[in-house]
């Protein structure tokens, strides 16, 4: 259980870094922000990549797949808290489906190649 909570914390931090880094590019390209926002954005994306290497997993692909569910939750939370947009029923249903998939992948654990 402790390892699962640790992985969740790393995934949540990685999601914040990835979403924040991508949002910097979005702000520069689509919202008219100055190019200076790209510097913290790139640093955030580099930190995102490093964080995923901290997850206790035998395979990168399984790590990235499980992370995807957490990323989607983070993106919807970002939508609400940062962009101020409402979360729709379809958003919530999509999150639930993705979390179920991530839970299945995470429950396999290490060495679950069968």
Swiss-Prot record:
Domain of life: Bacteria
Locations listed in the record: Cell inner membrane
Keyword Membrane on entry: yes
InterPro entries associated with the record: UPF0060
Membrane topology type: Multi-pass membrane protein
Major localisation: membrane
GO cellular component: plasma membrane
Annotated family: Belongs to the UPF0060 family.
Protein name per UniProt: UPF0060 membrane protein GDI3492/Gdia_2889
Phylogenetic lineage: Bacteria, Pseudomonadati, Pseudomonadota, Alphaproteobacteria, Acetobacterales
């Amino acid at each position: 259980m402790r390892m699962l909570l640790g992985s969740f914390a790393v995934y949540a931090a990685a999601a914040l870094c990835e979403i924040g880094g991508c949002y910097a590019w979005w702000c520069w390209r689509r919202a008219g922000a100055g190019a200076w926002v790209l510097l913290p954005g790139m640093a955030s994306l580099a930190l995102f990549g490093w964080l995923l290497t901290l997850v206790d997993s035998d395979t990168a692909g399984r790590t990235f797949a499980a992370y995807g569910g957490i990323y989607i939750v983070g993106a919807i939370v970002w939508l609400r808290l940062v962009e101020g947009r409402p979360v729709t029923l379809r958003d919530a249903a999509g999150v639930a489906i993705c979390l179920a998939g991530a839970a299945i992948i995470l429950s396999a654990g290490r060495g679950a190649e069968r």
